[in-house]
């Protein structure tokens, strides 16, 4: 059963394959909004805060950490899961400073992604 359109999960990643993976993992059970750049992510979140945000760091426009900082500066407390191929500790420390729910490294684990969605959204 899908969650209501009032409570979307946003997936922000510029890799079409990753977006398709999220659709395969969560699309049957949740309303997903796929976004491929930081500018659109900020604009869409300003209009409607998601119930959960999966956010890549390396995206066009403002990067994922800049998107995260923007949300927190506006007082938006959406649960954010950073999903990245970057291994540098500095990125994780910055993300943790902004209170991310989880910091995950690609490749993605289906069970972990589904459990996060169940825990945060339901």
What are these regions (language model features)?
Residues 17, 90, 108-117:
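C-terminal output helix
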Residues 16-33, 98:
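Two-component/phosphorelay signaling modules centered on CheY-like receiver
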Residues 66, 87-102, 115:
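Alpha4 helix (beta4-alpha4-beta5 surface) of REC/receiver domains from two-component response regulators
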Residues 37-40, 63-66:
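Acidic catalytic/metal-coordinating carboxylates
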Residues 48-54, 59:
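Active-site beta3 strand of CheY-like receiver
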Residues 19, 34, 60, 88:
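The feature encodes the CheY-like receiver
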Residues 1-10, 111-122:
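Non-catalytic signal-transmission and effector/linker regions of two-component phosphorelay proteins
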């Amino acid at each position: 059963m899908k969650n209501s359109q009032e409570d979307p999960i946003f997936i922000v990643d510029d890799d079409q394959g990753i977006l398709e993976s999220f659709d395969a993992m969560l699309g049957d059970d949740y309303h997903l909004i796929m976004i491929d750049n930081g500018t659109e992510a900020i604009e869409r979140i300003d209009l409607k805060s998601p119930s959960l945000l999966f956010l890549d760091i390396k995206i066009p426009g403002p990067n994922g950490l800049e998107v995260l900082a923007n949300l927190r500066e506006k007082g938006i407390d959406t649960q954010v899961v950073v999903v990245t191929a970057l291994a540098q500790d500095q990125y994780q420390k910055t993300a943790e400073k902004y209170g991310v729910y989880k910091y995950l490294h690609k490749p993605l684990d289906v069970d972990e992604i589904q459990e996060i969605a169940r825990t945060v959204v339901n």
